[in-house]
């Protein structure tokens, strides 16, 4: 869990990035050593949606897309998460009617609205629990750098605008480990959006022999239609809050102001009440992400919920058939393990 990314993470020649790079080299080496550790498998295909950096890249919309495609094919996939921001160690099957973000984390609540979802800090135990409950596939949202659960396919997601920042490893930059060896351990790269880094990322992945997918995060048009006539006050506590503003602006919505919060921020009424007051004063609509909105789904915010609009988004691939190829690869590898 991180707050706002330091500005120097996006600057190639920053002094702070250079000063911290020896620590980053150590962190990267330790992470790569950990990634080479032993794994435990389960008797169903395991598909990991990961990213090589910290912060928002579009993993959760990608996981939802993969889960939806498997469901369309008649499968019964389960989502598996560590449960960032939640207190439960698991394994536990998430119940959106009784669990809160404080229990299982915001991402798990969001995924549980679409498919059976297990939260477990011990990923092999979580996957085994999902299989015992009837999972045909396990789709991991994050966990690429954790070797404990054997993965049949790993799909990395990188934002096409942010890329990998300054290309350095934590804390000198946003990478969790050096990019090249992370790519070598993946099967495919999804470049989310057509930003300034998109083409270079695609070329790099191709040079490592990886399948490259291109996709766009699209907002729900019915919700956008309710926002187009006015101005919005947007707030978000995600890896890249600016992404919400960019999505709204690209859809033609006027933004009065963006209020960022740290990733996975545990909202309090004292955070939200001033935003509601400001929006009312300025005659703006208050809008946030679905991931933020699930953190407001408890009785402390009961009187505030009606004033906040959640903006659902979906990941849409430029070539959807490429996803089917990746899913078939996962199933073939799982069958070969059996």
From Swiss-Prot:
KW Flavoprotein (keyword) present: no
MF (Gene Ontology): ATP binding; tetraacyldisaccharide 4'-kinase activity
GO CC, one annotated term: plasma membrane
Catalytic activities: a lipid A disaccharide + ATP = a lipid IVA + ADP + H(+)
Keywords per UniProt: ATP-binding, Kinase, Lipid A biosynthesis, Lipid biosynthesis, Lipid metabolism, Nucleotide-binding, Transferase
Superkingdom field: Bacteria
Pathway(s) served: Glycolipid biosynthesis; lipid IV(A) biosynthesis; lipid IV(A) from (3R)-3-hydroxytetradecanoyl-[acyl-carrier-protein] and UDP-N-acetyl-alpha-D-glucosamine: step 6/6
EC number: 2.7.1.130
InterPro entries referenced in this protein's UniProt entry, alphabetically: LpxK, P-loop_NTPase
SUPFAM superfamilies: P-loop containing nucleoside triphosphate hydrolases
GO biological processes: lipid A biosynthetic process; lipopolysaccharide core region biosynthetic process
Binding positions (ATP): 53-60
EC class: transferase
Similarity-based family: Belongs to the LpxK family.
Protein's job: Transfers the gamma-phosphate of ATP to the 4'-position of a tetraacyldisaccharide 1-phosphate intermediate (termed DS-1-P) to form tetraacyldisaccharide 1,4'-bis-phosphate (lipid IVA).
Classification via NCBIfam families: lpxK
Name used for this protein in its record: Tetraacyldisaccharide 4'-kinase
